[in-house]
Amino acid sequence: MSITAEEKARLIKEYATKEGDTGSPEVQIAILSSRIATLTEHFKSHKKDNHSRRGLLMMVAQRRKLLDYVKGKDEARYQKLISSLGLRR
């Protein structure tokens, strides 16, 4: 249910704004999106797993907050991020 260290390192490298950047909103949103996609696949075969569903909803809320933050800071950065991640907004 979690992402591998290699996948996480790839996401950090792809979305980092500078070398060694692991905490920028872009990196956090990319990692959360990957975890959300993994959990969504999990729910296709485990429909009654409500404990994990709560975790999924918390991750979605956290990603929404981070996306709102980026949108408030820089609209162009926000548009670039959601298009590269394939999010719907």
Curated annotation (Swiss-Prot):
Top-level taxonomic group: Bacteria
Q: Which PROSITE patterns match?
A: RIBOSOMAL_S15
Q: Which InterPro entries match?
A: Ribosomal_uS15, Ribosomal_uS15_bac-type, uS15_NS1_RNA-bd_sf
Show the GO cellular component annotation of the record.
cytosolic small ribosomal subunit
Which segments does the entry list as coiled coil?
none
Which Gene Ontology molecular-function terms are recorded?
rRNA binding; structural constituent of ribosome
Q: Does the record bear Magnesium in its keywords?
A: no
GO annotation terms (biological process)? translation
Answer whether the UniProt record assigns the keyword Acetylation to this protein: no
Q: Disulphide bridges in this chain?
A: none
Per UniProt, which keywords does this protein have? Answer: Ribonucleoprotein, Ribosomal protein, RNA-binding, rRNA-binding
Q: Member of which family? A: Belongs to the universal ribosomal protein uS15 family.
Record's subunit section? Part of the 30S ribosomal subunit. Forms a bridge to the 50S subunit in the 70S ribosome, contacting the 23S rRNA.
Q: What NCBIfam families does this protein map onto?
A: S15_bact
What is the purpose of this protein?
Answer: One of the primary rRNA binding proteins, it binds directly to 16S rRNA where it helps nucleate assembly of the platform of the 30S subunit by binding and bridging several RNA helices of the 16S rRNA. Forms an intersubunit bridge (bridge B4) with the 23S rRNA of the 50S subunit in the ribosome.
Q: What is this protein called?
A: Small ribosomal subunit protein uS15
Taxon lineage: Bacteria, Pseudomonadati, Pseudomonadota, Alphaproteobacteria, Rhodobacterales
The gene name reads rpsO
